[in-house]
Structure formats: structure tokens, C-alpha cells
Amino acid sequence: TTACSDWDDHYDANGIVTGSATTTLWENMSANKNLSDFAALAKKAGYDQVLSNPQTYTVWAPLNGSFDYETLNNMDLATMKKQFMQNHVAHFNYPASGSVDKSVYMINEKMKKFVGNGTYTMGGLELVQPNIPNSNGTLHAINGKLDFGFNIYESINANDYPLDSVSAYFAKYDMKSLDVENSVKGPVVDGQITYLDSVLVEYNALANNMRAYINNEDSNYTMILPTNEAWIEKKQYVDALLDYLPSYQ
């Protein structure tokens, strides 16, 4: 359809750093012995297919030994994919050339600062080998793993704080929808579009109803939440004041 063609054109490879690049991001990554750990995790997450297609990407790939490969390899696949792999890949070309001061949205919708002039950093990490050209984008080798950075929405469910009661209550209103623009389209099967990588937008209907878009990282919020102990105490107090119908008890 026209819409699908437009979507493909939106991410068609263009403006490659050098016009002689003939191999894909995946081919270059998988052939680079200094990026073998990152390439192994990329393949595990299905990004060998994503980074082989003709849409344009920039990858900031951490060098071997600059991150904890074993921990990531043993992580739940969905978590590793979102917090690590999608955290190092962005749509479009972001070359390290001249003066750069950009806020880059990664595939997982985390924002990173890409800055420099002669020497460059991404998310505070040095680009040790910038501008490795590819037929479908640009590859930068970096010295370390980019920080994931939990937003408020994610922190509530991270189990790092005594907020289980609040988390369970909010979870009733958790929603997900497909981010068509950032998902990577695959072949059409039986007339239906398939995706090599489906990016899901997570949001909370309860918070959104209060116009508290706590999963939106282009805004800043402060949220004060009760601990489990405080939640249970106040809930019991309120429950004693209310006379519930039998069907709501």
C-alpha cells in the first residue's frame, strides 16, 4: 500500500558516511572480533535480522570487556532486549562529524545525549571507533554499556523499593500498544504485515487519566508514593469508613 511504501521510504538508507559501504550493520558487527559479545547478544535478541534490513540505523556498540556479557546473556530475553539491545540502536544516521549536540531517541524510546567536536561521547561514553560505514547506517564502537535509566513508571515496578502495594494497584491499569513507527517491519504474510521487531509502548491508564504521563521521558515529574506499610495502614483506615456493597467486597 501507499502507506507502507511511505513508511519504508521514511527509513530508507541515505547519507552514508562513505559512499563505498556495501555491507550491512549486522555483517560488519558480526565480522568484528572486538564486538563479538555485542553481536552474540544482538543475534540472541533477533537483531541480526533487524540490522540486515535496508532501513537506516545507527548502532553504538560496546567493545568486548567494557560490559558484563555474562549477566546480560543470562537475563530474561525480553528484559535484555529492551534494556540493552534496543538501548544501543536508533533509527536514522547519526555520524560523528563536526560539532554534534543531539538528543537521540533509541529504539526503546530512551533519550541519550550525543555530543562532541573532534572527539565524541554518547550517553557520557567515549566513541573509541566512530563512523564505521555500512550499507544501512552507521556503527560507532563505544567504551562501555549505555545506562538504561528507569523512568518513574518503570521504577514503580522495578522491585528496588518497598512499593509492592502501589505497584500491584497500578498494574491493574497497565496497557500496551504497538509502536508502528519504531517497530521493524518484516514481510507481508497472508496479506498481513509482520514485524522483525515489535516495539511496544507501555503506559498506565490510571496515571494518564490524571495527566501524569510518568512513562513519557520528554517531561519531568516528581511522584510521592507510600511504602507498603503506609499503603496497608491507610487502606485499612479508609476501608473501615466505607460500607461496600457485597459485590464490591
What are these regions (language model features)?
Residues 4-249:
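Mature, structured domains of secreted/extracytosolic soluble proteins
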